[in-house]
């Protein structure tokens, strides 16, 4: 793959060059097939551990500050790197604001599911307000992210049965939203069976989500 020409800031071009230096062309072919919503030419082919390592190296640098302001990104790996940089933001307000600024540009499941600022775990009550907002979004991956945050942070000690209703109330024709709903309910069956099981036994979910939830629950026990 030839690197796309750029009129970006020098800091952004430098980071893009670092990504291309980590390129694995065979992995690019493999990874492109896993993300059918993305044009193959927007995937460089950098493995996730290397992206996370680069994010760690760039954290708190002026280059990273310029990079995260430069939206939209062209390459999948630029979005993934941006997501991993957000994970290290230590102030909750900043992490939330930057996540909300970034979410409209997320265009695939891999970036959507890969990140959550660590500080979110320390502010679960405050995060719920944002999650409700995300669930009502008209952006596919913003909704998916909201359901993912419910699954990540609110199926253990912070669980409340009403959160199941929040996820069930999301109505969408989008595959990547509905798959996350099914994943959420399958995980809820494992972690909060008393609350989650009636959603299946009483057939409260739509048929597709009901069936996919059972499928994912069975697969997770293999």
Where do the model's predicted regions map?
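Alpha-helical scaffold domains
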Residues: 2-222
């Amino acid at each position: 793959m030839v690197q796309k020409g750029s009129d970006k800031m020098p800091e952004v071009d430098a980071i893009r060059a670092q990504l291309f230096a980590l390129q694995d062309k065979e992995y690019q072919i493999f990874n492109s097939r896993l993300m059918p919503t993305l044009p193959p030419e927007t995937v460089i082919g950098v493995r996730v551990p290397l992206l996370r390592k680069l994010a760690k190296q760039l954290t708190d640098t002026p280059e990273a500050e310029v990079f995260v302001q430069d939206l939209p990104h062209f390459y999948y790996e630029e979005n993934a790197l941006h997501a991993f940089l957000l994970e290290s933001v230590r102030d909750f307000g900043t992490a939330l604001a930057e996540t909300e600024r970034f979410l409209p540009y997320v265009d695939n499941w891999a970036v959507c599911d890969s990140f959550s600022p660590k500080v979110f775990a320390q502010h679960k009550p405050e995060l719920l307000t944002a999650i409700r907002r995300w669930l009502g979004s008209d952006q596919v991956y913003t909704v998916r992210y909201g359901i993912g945050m419910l699954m990540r942070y609110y199926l253990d000690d912070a669980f409340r049965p009403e959160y199941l209703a929040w996820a069930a109330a999301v109505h969408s024709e989008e595959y990547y939203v509905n798959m996350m709903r099914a994943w959420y309910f399958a995980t809820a069956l494992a972690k909060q069976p008393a609350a989650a099981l009636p959603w299946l036994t009483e057939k409260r979910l739509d048929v597709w989500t009901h069936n996919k939830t059972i499928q994912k629950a069975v697969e997770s026990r293999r």
